[in-house]
Curated annotation (Swiss-Prot):
Ranges annotated as spanning the membrane: none
Source lineage: Bacteria, Bacillati, Cyanobacteriota, Cyanophyceae, Synechococcales
GO molecular function annotations of the record: glutamyl-tRNA reductase activity; NADP binding
Biological processes per GO annotation: chlorophyll biosynthetic process; protoporphyrinogen IX biosynthetic process
Residues engaged in binding NADP(+): 198-203
Name the record gives this protein: Glutamyl-tRNA reductase
Organism the protein comes from: Synechococcus sp. (strain CC9311)
Function: Catalyzes the NADPH-dependent reduction of glutamyl-tRNA(Glu) to glutamate 1-semialdehyde (GSA).
Highest taxon of source: Bacteria
EC code: 1.2.1.70
Catalytic activity from the UniProt record: (S)-4-amino-5-oxopentanoate + tRNA(Glu) + NADP(+) = L-glutamyl-tRNA(Glu) + NADPH + H(+)
Family that this chain belongs to: Belongs to the glutamyl-tRNA reductase family.
CDD domains reported in the protein's UniProt record: NAD_bind_Glutamyl_tRNA_reduct
Entries under Pfam families matching the protein: GlutR_dimer, GlutR_N, Shikimate_DH
Free-text domain note: Possesses an unusual extended V-shaped dimeric structure with each monomer consisting of three distinct domains arranged along a curved 'spinal' alpha-helix. The N-terminal catalytic domain specifically recognizes the glutamate moiety of the substrate. The second domain is the NADPH-binding domain, and the third C-terminal domain is responsible for dimerization.
């Protein structure tokens, strides 16, 4: 068995490719089931965010298992393998484990140290558990990855001052507005007429950062006004008008800055829509949705500037340099956590022998106990029988404790295999203990 990950991210694929592979939560169960239906895939878990899609698997054969995942991605995205392959990365076992640790710690994020990825990995684990696509191996790996992400954030300063995708989007708006005025600086948003489309987690973060950057008011649009209103109540100091998506054209006509972050299959803003409006001023659109909420043809519309998540790199680079040293400190923690998981993985090699040893001793215990109880006769009470039963079980557990602990303790594989062979021979257990390749 092997752990493997196949995926793509902002580092390997542009947003127009990433959006084709995005897997929304409502189709996650079907996607996980499709993966698990393949004979090579024993466990599967999917991480789908605006900047990455990664599929973690436990497979029988690494080459065949990875090929199955690649076929799934090609079928899901509608992209031919030759078009998709240049954007994919693949990591095997040790590298796959290390990659997940880096991702969860925020070291592989567009925004170094951002905290949202930790919640997204937690969600990946929860969905895998709910849909029964992960078993003991990936469950252990994901649990340790989440623990590692928390540890990195508590034991280093990586999360101090970290920006998120949403805060980077707001800073990008400030930067572009400043540049349009001849200033290479972040300017206040106080005079901008601002709209936010969507009322999910990303929109919540947008409102939080817009308020911090001086926005005097925001129009919040969503399919259901009730959800927008519920979100608005969390920002009593920021004037928010809640509207339905029916008012989107009006907002595009009157606002100077529009952020979009809503779950859609197709863009909700395109050139035809904008050209049909009677606009009198410039419009800046910032789209942090994946799949994209704004079509690429809006660049052709006069007076309109549009940016997507890939354009956030300009802001990110202004914040990254000072954080690189902290990231290097975090790498040491990741190496330690990765080693701990691999030690646990290696210890699984001993499980078949341990199970056979336990079964052999249990068979002896039951046989000898049965003989002893038959000699005690009918005068031996049920309570006394239970006491003797517990006594013999306790003795077996005491006898097994030290050898089992030693067999599963961290050690060189050759040493463990030698110890397993000795146990197999001494106790005359079945040969051919299963091993981890």
């Amino acid at each position: 068995m092997h752990i493997a990950v196949v995926g793509l991210s902002h580092r390997t694929a542009p947003v127009e490719v990433r959006e084709k592979l995005s897997i929304p939560e409502q189709t996650m169960e079907e996607s996980l089931q499709n993966l698990r239906n393949h004979e090579q895939v024993l466990e599967a878990s999917i991480l789908s965010t605006c900047n990455r899609l990664e599929i973690y698997t436990l497979v029988r054969n690494p080459d065949l298992g990875i090929a199955a995942v690649r076929d799934f991605l090609s079928g899901h995205s509608g992209l031919e393998s030759r078009d998709l392959s240049p954007h994919l990365f693949t990591y095997h076992h040790d590298e796959a484990i290390a990659h997940l640790m880096r991702v969860t710690a925020g070291l592989d994020s567009l925004v170094l140290g951002e905290g949202q990825i930790l919640s997204q990995v937690k969600k990946m684990m929860r969905l895998g558990q709910e849909h029964k696509s992960i078993g003991p191996i990936l469950n252990r790996l994901l649990t340790q990855a989440v623990s590692t992400g928390k540890r990195v954030r508590s034991e280093t300063n990586l999360s101090t001052g970290a920006v998120s995708v949403s805060s980077a989007a707001v800073e990008l708006a400030q930067l572009k507005l400043g540049q349009s005025r001849g200033q290479d600086a972040l300017v206040t948003l106080e005079t901008e007429q601002i709209a936010v489309v969507g009322a999910g987690r990303m929109s919540r973060l947008l409102l939080q950062h817009l308020q911090a950057k001086g926005a005097s008011g925001v129009v919040l649009l969503n399919r259901t006004i009730e959800r927008a209103s519920a979100l608005a109540t969390d920002f009593p100091n920021l004037p928010i008008q809640c509207r339905g998506l029916d008012d989107l054209d009006q907002c595009l006509s009157t606002c100077s800055l529009v952020f979009t972050s809503t779950a859609v299959d197709d863009p909700i803003i395109d050139a035809n829509r904008l050209n049909a409006l009677n606009r009198r001023s410039s419009l800046r659109l910032i789209d942090i949705g994946v799949p994209r909420n704004i079509a690429s043809d809006v660049h052709e519309v006069s007076g309109v500037e549009s940016h997507d998540v890939d354009d956030l790199q300009e802001v990110v680079e202004r914040n990254q340099e000072a954080r690189q040293q902290v990231a290097r400190e975090a790498e040491g923690l990741l190496l330690e956590e990765g080693r701990l998981f691999l030690e646990w993985w290696d210890s699984l090699e001993a499980v078949p022998t341990i199970n056979r040893l336990r079964a052999s001793l249990e068979e002896i215990r039951v046989e000898e106990l049965t003989k002893a109880l038959s000699r005690m006769g009918p005068d031996f009470s049920a309570r006394e029988r239970k006491v003797v039963e517990a006594l013999t079980k306790g003795m077996i557990n005491k006898i097994l404790h030290t050898p089992v602990t030693q067999l599963r303790s961290p050690q060189q594989r050759s040493e463990r295999q030698q110890a397993l062979q000795v146990v197999e021979k001494i106790f005359d257990l079945e040969s051919g203990a299963a091993t981890q390749d």
